[in-house]
Amino acid sequence: KPNKDKKISIICYNYPPGEANLFGGAFLDTFVSVSQILQRLVQEGYTTKALTPEELREVFTAGRAVNSGKYDCNWEGMIRYSTRNYHAPKEVTEHWGKAPGEIMAEEKEFLIPGVEVGNVLIGLQPARGRDSDQEQSYHDKTLPPHHQYIAFYQWLREEFRTDAVIHVGTHGTLEFLKGKESGLSQDCYPDYLIYDLPHFYLYYCGNPSEAVVAKRRSYAQIISYQPPVFEESDLYGQYLELSTEVDNYHQSLALSPAMAEQTL
């Protein structure tokens, strides 16, 4: 298939859910990274367009395409996936109730937070659980994913018909879903959701232990990235003023203790 006909899904994170935590990723400026990925895809002949980091941020914040927005949610702007096309293991219904459930759903449709830029989908990985138990459920390997989580990856495969998935940054939750540690089967949720899709994962090089989990449990091709370069920083603003006052105080102690008291 020529590049111009291929569809790519770029998946970013929104943890905890809401407007304040878009495009999270350890030691990574994810908006800049996704912008550069789009530029490279355009150069390689994919049907999409380049967006600046500022344009990407505007698309998701002004468009309110987020997981369970705390201030407002643009339900009309969400991609929708009908429950008529949805299928899930029995265990999911037993735990979360009848589809579509209460998380990112409206009537008989799932809400998919993301934008299509030509043949490229830039989406947000679903939250792991309800707002009240996000931290507890993040690495919980006994909790089955909720309906909208499963619907998100089904939509990528069956409706959007993606040719590859790229998870951007450390780290998401797909690789920590319920199932065996190795030798996964279709009864294991990472396998059930990613199955045979080509999967690329941008992962921080300082976290090889969890990168191995992503490789083993979600069949990811790991693309390592380095942390930002550390640089010496000068004082600025009130910190600079405070440093000057401290220096003046110590000089006054030696020359005129009375003036030192006035400095305090």
PLM features: residue spans?
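Solvent-exposed alpha-helices and their adjacent loops that cap or buttress functional pockets
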Residues: 2-4, 112-116, 157-159
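Non-catalytic accessory regions outside enzyme or core folds
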Residues: 7, 255, 259-264
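Extended, H/D-rich, highly charged conserved domains that either
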Residues: 13-124
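Sequence-level motif detector for i,i+2 pairs with an aromatic at +2
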Residues: 5, 117-119, 218
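Flexible, glycine/charged-enriched surface loops at secondary-structure junctions
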Residues: 2, 47-55, 257-261
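Catalytic or ion-translocation cores adjacent to nucleophile or general acid/base/metal-coordination motifs
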Residues: 21, 25-49, 121-125, 132-254
